[in-house]
Design a protein with these regions (language model features):
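Active-site microenvironments that recognize anionic phosphate/pyrophosphate groups
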Residues: 1-123, 129-189, 209-212, 221-224, ...
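Extended C-terminal subregions enriched in glycine
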Residues: 202-217
Length: 288
């Protein structure tokens, strides 16, 4: 199953979904925040909420927005554990609902936080896409003969542990201070993780964002995305649920930009040693 607007570059094999309708979306909302209670997308009071994206990256109801909190200035780092867990629970519920559709083979949860990332609305929210195929990067991970996430990571790359979850800096991170959060058990996706495990994910995610805010300042801009088992009905035995948390800063006050050499050659350059990044993030949690 594919995407009707998907094009594959004949030179590189890059996947591009053409979405001309998104050119008409507003850069910034006019007047009141549409995500605050009483706003355009949230006419009634709520704790967490989802709705179809008005300017979807994918058509036919396969693009959703998830509101994390009714508070306009809330964040994972400021929420109490139960509030953060409600967001993860909604991610899980929507993964199951979208994944049950015959036209969805992969459910992709992500968050772009901050204007530096391109977020046009400050209110805390994430998005979910239901792809009609398995995207290339998750597909590459899933094609590995064994599950790398089931191996014990180097101690020097560990940032923190919580319950059944482990947060590490990847051995070859694409972004300085990127963190990978994964369950210690081989769990395939959010729905099968179970409520207690999903609560643990919310706690360790919030803790990792607190560390980023301590390093870069409050409201650190970041990208977040989740890789999990496809929903196409195949077994996918190597699927191991995990979350990437990538701040776009390389140091306080300095943004990490992708260069033409990186985009053109497909070779990334990371100016921060992964073990040093892990040590800094680890130290920021001491005594917390």
């Amino acid at each position: 199953m594919g995407e009707s607007d998907l094009r594959i570059d004949p030179l590189t094999g890059a996947h591009v979904i053409v979405t001309p309708w998104r050119q008409h979306r507003p850069n910034l909302p006019d007047g009141h925040c549409p995500f605050c209670p009483g706003g355009l997308e949230a006419p009634e009071p709520y704790d967490v909420r989802f709705f179809p994206n008005r300017w979807p990256g994918l058509p036919t109801g396969r693009a959703e927005v998830v509101l994390h909190s009714p508070q306009h200035d809330a964040s994972f780092s400021s929420m109490d554990p139960d509030a953060a867990a409600r967001v993860v629970e909604l991610w899980s519920a929507r993964t199951a609902a979208l994944g049950a559709r015959p036209d969805v083979d992969y459910v992709f949860v992500f968050e772009n936080k901050g204007r530096l990332i391109g977020a046009t609305i400050d209110h805390p929210h994430s998005q979910i896409l239901g792809f009609g195929l398995v995207p290339p990067i998750p597909g590459t991970e899933l094609a590995q003969p064994t599950c790398d996430l089931c191996r014990n990571p180097d101690d020097e790359l560990i940032v923190t542990r919580h319950s059944k979850w482990l947060a590490t800096v990847p051995w070859a991170p694409s972004w300085p201070y990127e963190t990978l959060i994964a369950p210690r058990d081989h769990v395939a996706d959010l729905p099968t993780a179970g409520p207690a495990s999903r609560h643990g994910l919310a706690v360790i995610l919030a803790e990792c964002i607190v560390r980023l805010d301590a390093l870069f300042g409050p409201g650190t801009p970041y990208m977040l995305w989740i890789h999990q088992r496809p929903t196409d009905g195949d077994e996918w035995p190597t699927a191991h649920l995990h979350l990437h948390l990538a701040p776009v800063m390389r140091s306080p006050g300095a943004v990490r930009h992708l260069s033409s050499a990186e985009l053109g050659a497909g070779m990334l350059f990371n100016s921060v040693d992964p073990s040093q990044a892990a040590a800094e993030l680890r130290k920021l949690g001491e005594g917390a």
